[in-house]
């Protein structure tokens, strides 16, 4: 289960749009199958995850946090934070595995190693831009993210979609009460968790924006009509974000670090230069989701990809290798990593999905524990027999009195 979206950063054309599980349209001809497909609330095969599915983007969102901070002036390219095995505030502790502890760490390195502390502190400073009014910082942050197409409909030429969620001060005033909340209550937003929700299409689009250093074209699937190129200005006019182009260079270097010395170094390749970011999205209903965003090549990027595998665990487990292989085939017209292809083909998450199905049945009170009748049933019967025979063996004889 999951989705993959690939865009051409140069024009916004959707190169690939995949959602799984897939269905055979002919199944709708069968009344029983049609009903089963529509009512399947677990696998949801009729649900377009690429356009409608909303997920916390996890660490793939950290670059966007940094870009907002750079534009707002709450941090610079030289800003460092000290990771103490994660972010700490009072009794709160957000763990981190960046490996660079108790020493100043810069932005470029923090992206490569995916330091949770760095982007938590960066987000805290964003919200605290005006220490006397947190709404100033969070609303400016939200406006910048809206300019990336986040928190609103993308306006594609497809009939469905989701806005996702980018929270504002009003959102938290309604939840906690006006003036009650503070940066620490919403700190997980900085890492793409908390209340952040995006679609795979939106993730691919903000990756294209980073590739373009600040602009994008509205994603669309139509290339031409009756052989004539698309002329609709909705899809042909460049849209600039609120982030200055100068802030994107360090972000791109950090995304390259992800492959050279960071979390994706296990599937880097010499065939082409790729820039990416791993993500692991926490999921309260089962194993974490595996996410990855990528653009390539270095000179005039041709493709931007977002991949999510539901319950796929780490971003490097499934989503990362899948995105990298797609980019390799598109950029080089060949794949030189057959072992990685085979590993993806052999991957299987049916055990995790089966566990979720059993949990669902238990919540509904419909689960029946399986019983192996041949082995367990006979064993129980034999035990009963032995117990009865033992009882008879030691039972005292009755004495009948004669009249």
Q: Across the structure, where does each feature detected by a protein language model lie?
A:
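Short, gly/Ser/Thr-rich active-site loops of penicillin-recognizing serine hydrolases
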Residues: 230-239, 322-388, 393
């Amino acid at each position: 289960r999951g989705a993959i979206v690939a865009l051409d950063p140069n024009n916004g054309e959707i190169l690939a749009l995949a959602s799984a599980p897939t269905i055979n349209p002919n199944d709708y001809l069968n009344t029983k199958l049609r009903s089963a497909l529509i009512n399947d609330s677990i696998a949801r095969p009729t649900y377009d995850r690429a356009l409608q599915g909303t997920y916390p983007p996890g660490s793939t969102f950290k670059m966007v946090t940094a870009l907002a901070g750079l534009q707002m002036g709450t941090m610079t390219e030289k800003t460092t934070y000290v990771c103490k095995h994660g972010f700490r505030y009072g009794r709160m502790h957000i763990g981190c595995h960046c490996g660079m502890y108790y020493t100043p760490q810069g932005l470029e390195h923090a992206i490569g190693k995916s330091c949770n502390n760095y982007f938590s502190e960066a987000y805290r400073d964003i919200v605290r831009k005006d220490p006397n009014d947190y709404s100033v910082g969070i609303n400016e942050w939200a406006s910048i993210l809206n300019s990336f197409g986040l928190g609103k409909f993308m306006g594609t030429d497809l009939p469905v979609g989701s806005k996702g969620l980018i929270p504002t001060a009003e959102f938290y005033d309604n939840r906690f009460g006006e003036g009650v909340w503070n940066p620490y209550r919403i700190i997980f937003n900085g890492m793409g968790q908390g209340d952040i929700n995006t679609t795979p299409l939106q993730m691919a689009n903000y990756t294209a924006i980073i590739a373009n250093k600040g602009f994008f074209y509205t994603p669309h699937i139509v290339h031409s009509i009756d052989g004539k190129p698309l002329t609709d200005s909705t899809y042909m006019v460049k849209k600039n974000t609120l982030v200055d182009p100068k802030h994107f260079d360090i972000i791109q270097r950090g995304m390259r670090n992800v492959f050279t010395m960071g979390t994706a170094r296990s599937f880097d390749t010499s065939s082409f230069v790729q820039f990416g970011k791993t993500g692991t999205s926490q999921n309260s209903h089962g194993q974490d989701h595996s996410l990855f965003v990528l653009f390539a090549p270095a000179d005039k990027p041709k493709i931007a990809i977002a991949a999510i595998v539901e319950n796929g665990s780490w971003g490097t487990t499934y989503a990362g290798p899948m995105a990298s292989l797609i980019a390799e085939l598109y950029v080089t017209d060949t794949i030189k990593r057959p072992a990685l292809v085979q590993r993806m083909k052999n991957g299987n998450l049916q055990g995790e999905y089966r566990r979720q199905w059993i949990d669902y049945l238990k919540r509904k009170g419909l689960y029946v524990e399986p019983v192996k009748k041949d082995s367990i049933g006979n064993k129980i019967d034999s035990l009963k027999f032995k117990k009865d025979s033992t009882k008879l063996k030691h039972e005292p004889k009755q004495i009948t009195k004669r009249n």
